[in-house]
Amino acid sequence: MLELKKLEYNYDALEPIINKETVSFHHDKHHQTYYDNTNNLIKNTSLEDKDLEYILTHLDEVDESIRTKLKNNAGGSYNHDLYWNIMNPVNKEEIHGELSEAINKAFGSFEEFKEKFVEEGLKVFGSGWVWLVKENDNLKIITTSNQDSPITLGFKIIFGNDVWEHAYYLNYQNKRKEYLEKWFD
């Protein structure tokens, strides 16, 4: 059985970027629901004892009638696991070394990368994610709809940001651009 991990930080640790009410509701309600639904969908299947990455890369092992629901819920679980880890203020440090060099090579500079990341995040119609991924030896920014995960497309995820309104609405209402810009703080 898959279990949602407790956050490694307090709900208020992301303030002022994201307030504790948003973190609490987002993690304990939305994220937990993805885990609950995933567990219900994989019960009594060949994926029951597998991890999320395996599930998402082996969706063809389940009946087609539940495949889309499983992709959405396992994707929501996996994507949010990454999101909370990326946002962990304990791990927060400047991007440097090989990643910094790769970003500069792909986008010109970190500032140009941030602008492009925000721009792509604003293009997501409705709900989805904006990602920095690695394909072969190249970095690129992609977006996915709903809870689709780049690993199902063969990408290695560097990091991503949730642009579903529940991720930012209590703080930013409909101002997704402001949320995306402040997310890098």
Short names for language-model regions:
Residues 1-185:
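Feature for soluble, non-membrane regions of globular proteins
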